[in-house]
């Protein structure tokens, strides 16, 4: 599966419902209709997109938007970012402050396991999980940030800061 096919699948469920749960239910139906090879390829693309977004700059944006962001929260944030679609995802990976134009990013842990769950249900094979979900990178790409350095955060993420933190200063 190439990126174009992956993003087409994500876009196909974007219009279904208002909540992330409704969108995931729609995505699950699309995944159920796929052959096993495509399920595996879809999961590989999820993992690829998660790693591509594993960046300190994006983590800083998530920290501002969520009022703090642990490792696990950042993982779920990145999954939610994927569910926002190709344009939002790609813009945020390059320039995280563009998320000021997007609004809330729902944490979306279920996306990380959905294709594996469909595969397991179909094949009664839980070993599929062992193939995926390994963090290949020890640390995110880019320069780390000090979550308490408000001057840096305000400078690096001016639009997000204005929306989420301006009242704090």
Predicted regions and their residues:
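Long, solvent-exposed, polar/charged low-complexity segments
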Residues: 7-8, 13, 126-169
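A glycine-rich, hydrophobic loop/mini-helix early in the fold
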Residues: 29-68
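Terminal interaction module
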Residues: 82, 110, 119, 152-157, ...
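Residue-level detector of well-ordered alpha-helical segments, enriched
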Residues: 2-5, 22-26, 38, 42, ...
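N-terminal, charge-rich interaction modules
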Residues: 1-29, 34, 167
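Hydrophobic/aromatic-rich, well-ordered segments within soluble, folded domains that form packed cores
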Residues: 63-93, 99
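An exposed acidic His-Trp-rich patch
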Residues: 88-121
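Short, hydrophobic/amphipathic alpha-helical patches that form generic packing surfaces
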Residues: 7-12, 44-48, 52, 72-86, ...
């Amino acid at each position: 599966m190439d990126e174009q096919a992956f993003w087409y699948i994500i876009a196909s469920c974007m219009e279904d419902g208002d909540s992330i749960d409704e969108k995931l239910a729609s995505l699950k139906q699309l995944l159920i209709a796929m052959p096993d090879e495509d399920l595996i390829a879809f999961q590989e693309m999820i993992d690829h997109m998660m790693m591509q977004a594993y960046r300190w700059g994006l983590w800083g944006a998530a920290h501002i938007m969520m009022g703090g962001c642990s490792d696990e929260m950042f993982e779920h944030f990145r999954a939610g970012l994927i569910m926002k679609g190709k344009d939002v995802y790609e813009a945020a990976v390059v320039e995280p402050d563009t998320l000021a134009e997007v609004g809330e990013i729902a944490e979306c842990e279920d996306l990380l396991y959905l294709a594996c769950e469909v595969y397991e249900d179909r094949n009664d094979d839980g070993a599929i999980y062992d193939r995926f979900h390994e963090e290949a990178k020890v640390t995110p790409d880019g320069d780390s940030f000090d979550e308490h350095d408000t001057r840096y955060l305000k400078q690096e993420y001016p639009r997000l800061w204005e929306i989420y933190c301006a009242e704090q200063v």
